[in-house]
A protein has these predicted regions:
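Short, well-structured alpha-helical segments
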Residues: 61-65, 81-82
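Active-site neighborhoods of divalent-metal-dependent phosphate/nucleic-acid chemistry enzymes
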Residues: 71-114
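Acidic, PIN/NYN-like endoribonuclease modules and their adjacent C-terminal/linker elements
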Residues: 1, 70, 102-135
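A general alpha-helix detector
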Residues: 8-9, 46-47, 83
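Short, conserved active-site loops that position catalytic residues or coordinate cofactors/metal ions
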Residues: 40-45
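Short beta-strand scaffold positions
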Residues: 4, 38-39, 75, 111
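Short, well-structured N-terminal submotif of metal-dependent ribonuclease cores
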Residues: 1-38, 52-62, 119, 133-135
């Protein structure tokens, strides 16, 4: 199981070079392995907020709808928020990603911001690293 961080989705949706290629390849690989990938609830909101100015509301919604064909939203609750708040991560949003990853049983968090997750109990990997590992 893999939790996708917001930056991976934005790389694909906004075609952000040079990262779009690896992020798109990871999504394509996960599409062939349904229900192996998750996003957090707040990733959906963050994605929409950040993608809408470039893609527009309709295209941003369509991207998210297409994504839900093979990606699930991690089931989180109050206990997961408490867990996130207890983590020794400087950014609460990153801690919430870790809590969501734990809640869905993810083995990895797919992100370009690996350094932000150094103290995470769920290891972070770049899309390139995950492509190599999952091949």
């Amino acid at each position: 199981m893999i939790l996708l961080d917001t930056d991976v989705l934005l790389d694909v949706a906004l075609d952000r070079a040079p990262h779009a290629e690896a992020s798109a390849a990871l999504l394509e690989l996960l599409e062939r392995r349904p229900r192996m990938a998750f996003v957090s609830w707040h990733t959906v909101a963050n994605f929409f907020y950040l993608a809408r100015p470039s893609r527009g509301a309709q295209q941003s919604r369509e991207f998210l709808t297409d994504l839900t064909g093979f990606v699930s939203v991690a089931p989180t609750d109050t206990e997961d928020l408490r867990y996130a708040a207890s983590l020794a991560l400087p950014d609460l949003e990153d801690a919430m990603q870790v809590a969501a990853a734990r809640a869905c049983g993810a083995q990895y968090i797919a992100t370009r911001n690996v350094k932000d997750f150094r103290k995470s109990p769920v290891p972070a990997r770049t899309p390139e690293e995950l492509l190599e590992e999952l091949g």
